[in-house]
Amino acid sequence: MTGELVLLTGGTGFLGYTILIDLIKHGYRVRVPARSHAKIARVRAAPSIAALNPPETHLMFVLVPDMAAPGAYDEAVQDVDLIIHSAAPLHTDQATGAAGDVKLEDAFVTACVQGNLGILKSACDKGKRVRRVVMTSSTVAIAPADFYSDAASAAQREAGNEVVRGPDTRVPVPAPPYKSQLHAYCSAKAASLKAAEDYIKDHSPHFDLISIMPSLIFGKDELATGTASTGMMMSRLLPGTDSNDSNNNNFGKGEITAVGNAVLCNDVARAHVRALDTDIEGNQSFVLNTDAKWEDTVPIATTHFPREFESGLFRPGGPHWTTVPLKWDTTKVQDVLGIKLATYDVMIKEVVGEYLEKTGSE
């Protein structure tokens, strides 16, 4: 509802910033917790914010240095009508131990669960006007974690591919020890989703909960300096875009197997904001995903950017990708939210286009 005040966590990050832009465009007033003045300044100076030029009454910031601390959001939630919790307080810098180290559980699972419970507790105790909390979850929260690593055998993946998972799918939370940071991340998403849903069920607060479950998010990142964000994604998919490969010749060898799921950042942001509307029922979830074949990345890019391939800026070849299909039922996204999800073709065009903008190669 236009004019309502939204507390947006994660608003200084990739997805959260895109949500922020969508909120402002749709007339919401937004309060963004930030860890530092530097992060606030970076958002204020970003191109879309500068172009929209929202008044101070429509874009506000509050310093929250430690978002995992008990009561961290107690002040931020006051007088707020709605909350979008897109922050993911994962302490990856602390997860430096060997695989299975307890540090993985603390850095990923504990941090993520505490983040979700912290915002819900603050909303329950201090946010008396809050009517809805929209949380960013992930498809990895509701699929077997082994599908996203090498732990699943080909036979297990083949059998799993016959299953169509949807917004009501739930899986047991994988227990430690964790084999890798990716395994711990999947566990963190499953555990934090369960913790949030259990909290709503056990406490019956004055607000409801909607979970948005995107797959791998692709899209422009205005806040990234250089090609740090786009390059990280594209360097694995498109030979010639690895900023760490000075010769542009040795990168992209070997075999890579990955789940073929992707979604456009703008679509994910739109889903979060649309979920705030009063005509959308609470206490439900939405899965956002488009099937992707990583093997198609170079052919798609060649179609949209032929000159860059002719010049040698991008090169055909690279690693041999094997796409693991993982099926999702996303019908609610269009039927309920009215969002038609972008194709993988659109994602590649947008991300490669931004890469060229940031490198001045257009």
Please identify what each model-predicted range represents.
Residues 85, 94-103, 107, 111-180:
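Conserved Rossmann-fold NAD(P)-dependent oxidoreductase catalytic core, especially the SDR/UDP-sugar
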Residues 258-259, 269-318, 350, 359-362:
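Mid/C-terminal beta-alpha module of Rossmann-like enzyme folds, strongest
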Residues 306-362:
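C-terminal amphipathic/interface module of NAD(P)-dependent oxidoreductases
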Residues 174-180, 220, 224-263:
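A conserved pocket-lining segment of Rossmann-fold NAD(P)-dependent short-chain dehydrogenase/reductase
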Residues 170-209:
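Active-site Tyr-X1-5-Lys
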Residues 35-114:
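NAD(P)H-binding glycine-rich loop region in Rossmannoid oxidoreductase-like domains
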Residues 203-206, 219-235, 274-285:
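Glycine/proline-rich active-site loop of Rossmann-fold NAD(P)-dependent oxidoreductases
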Residues 3-33:
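N-terminal Rossmann NAD(P)H-binding glycine-rich loop of SDR-like oxidoreductase domains
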